[in-house]
């Protein structure tokens, strides 16, 4: 999702998704920054399993929803926030706006994918990759480490979307590994190399690499899988590859959900979180067009092909990924936002 500027007009966010309202029971409001189709499938299945609970879905970019929840404060109609990336949840946690997730729900997923203090639960995972077009660049000629993207030999060959919230964890990892000065130099070099290939979103990066308009780019893996599913393997000459094991460009981040402290339907909201990490909820994620990794044990996906447990990402935990604010500040400093 793209970093957006929050305005009061977003307070009028219209409800979408979910099933038609049913009579009786309780209605919880879900603020969702996750993929609409997957969210709708999860909500529909949850409502069938919980006939006394209706879910009203309000979808928008996660950063916009973050700002909206903060602006609404104790008056927020949101009961649950479902994000694409952990920094959005960490931001609300830091603001003290999230309630504790039930211990039984947290026990369903590995603790490394959850809030370190139990304020939100991890639901699915994604990993940063390079997408490349072998018609323009051979795999052996690709950078294997994130800092190499600033090498002048890649000028006009690399694309990325600096406004995507998916890119913030990568910057945070580079900051952790190399410090601010080196990260600033890297971003300026990457900016110079991307030139006309600084894109508004990862969909554009994915499409243009696939069409042969630019050699390679940085995305999360699911964008490529989603494109291939939409247009077919025969129309997808592009490929994806990982950075070197444990390089800070190789970042695993999680999508998660939390209950708002201001929720007036906490019991029903907690039930929804429990469903997200249940076998049924995780199977929906495993077979959805989101192409993310389910994180509950015993649930696997055919796509992505590399199993979650075989990934070798940079060793950074969710607390260290933080709220993403340092990454945003640095992007603004180098005028990429």
What are these language model-derived features?
Residues 131-136, 252-265, 284, 288:
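A bilobed periplasmic-binding-protein/Venus flytrap-type ligand-binding module shared by bacterial periplasmic
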């Amino acid at each position: 999702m793209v970093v957006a500027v929050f305005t009061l007009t977003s307070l009028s966010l219209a409800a979408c998704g979910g099933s038609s309202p049913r009579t009786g029971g309780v209605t919880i409001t879900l603020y969702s920054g996750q993929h609409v189709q997957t969210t709708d499938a999860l909500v529909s299945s949850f409502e069938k399993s919980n006939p006394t609970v209706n879910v009203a879905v309000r979808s928008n970019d996660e950063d916009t929803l973050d700002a909206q929840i903060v602006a609404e404060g104790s008056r927020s109609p949101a009961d649950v926030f479902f994000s694409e990336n952990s920094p959005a949840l960490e931001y609300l946690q830091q603001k003290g706006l999230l309630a504790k997730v039930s211990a039984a729900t947290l026990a369903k997923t590995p603790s490394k994918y959850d809030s370190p203090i139990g304020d939100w639960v991890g639901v699915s995972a994604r990993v940063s990759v390079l997408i490349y077009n072998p018609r323009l660049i051979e795999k052996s000629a690709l950078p294997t480490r994130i800092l190499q993207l600033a090498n002048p030999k890649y000028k006009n060959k690399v694309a990325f979307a600096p406004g995507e919230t998916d890119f913030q964890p990568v910057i945070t990892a580079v900051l952790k590994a190399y410090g601010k000065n080196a990260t600033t130099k890297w971003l300026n070099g990457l900016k110079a190399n991307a030139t006309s290939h600084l894109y508004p979103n990862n969909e554009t990066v994915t499409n243009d690499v696939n069409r042969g308009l630019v050699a390679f780019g940085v995305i999360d893996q699911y964008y490529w899988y989603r494109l291939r599913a939409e247009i077919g393997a025969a129309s997808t000459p592009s490929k994806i590859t990982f950075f070197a094991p444990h390089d800070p460009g190789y970042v695993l981040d999680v999508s998660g959900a939390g209950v708002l402290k201001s929720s007036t339907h906490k019991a029903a909201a907690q039930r929804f979180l429990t469903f997200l990490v249940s076998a049924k909820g995780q199977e929906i994620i495993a077979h959805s067009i989101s192409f993310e990794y389910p994180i509950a044990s015993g649930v696997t996906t055919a796509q992505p092909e590399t199993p979650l447990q075989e990934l070798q990402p940079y060793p950074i935990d969710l607390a260290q990924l933080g709220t993403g604010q340092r990454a945003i500040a640095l992007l603004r400093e180098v005028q990429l936002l």
